[in-house]
């Protein structure tokens, strides 16, 4: 396993990288997935204590404010506070949406990216750029915010 220090967060790469999923003393934890990552990847994560699973539809057409509203509603429904964590398990849409929603919910909660596609591993999960599409234009609303860590599982 290899650790890369990027700005102020670690990027863990390797077959044992999921062991670096540090949820610390967060008050609540949610995992953002789509139907594909829920089916194929969620079971690979280490067991977490009572995580909330937030499932959105897969595809670029769902990377919008309506989906953000759904994510924010779920976080609110489950009483997430500023000491909560959102784990983004998926490709570029999940990383962009999850990071954007976490960074804007209650003026920012922590998030961790666990990218599941090569493009997300090389682009969407690193660099801190987060955005959603608006009026059918890509990444029209966004911001820059870094995750607590990026975990790239290679097994």
Q: Over which residues does each language-model region extend?
A:
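ATP/NTP phosphate-donor binding region
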Residues: 1-85
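Short secondary-structure boundary/capping segments
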Residues: 2-3, 78, 103, 139-142
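A glycine/threonine-rich phosphate-anchoring loop and its flanking beta-alpha core
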Residues: 106-155
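Short glycine-/acidic-enriched loop or helix-start segments at secondary-structure transitions
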Residues: 40-43, 97-99, 123
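Short, glycine/charged-enriched secondary-structure capping and boundary segments
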Residues: 44-48, 68-69, 101-104, 126-129, ...
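A short, small-residue-rich loop immediately preceding and capping a beta-strand
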Residues: 81-101, 105-117
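Hydrophobic, well-ordered secondary-structure scaffolds
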Residues: 68-73, 91, 103-104, 119-123
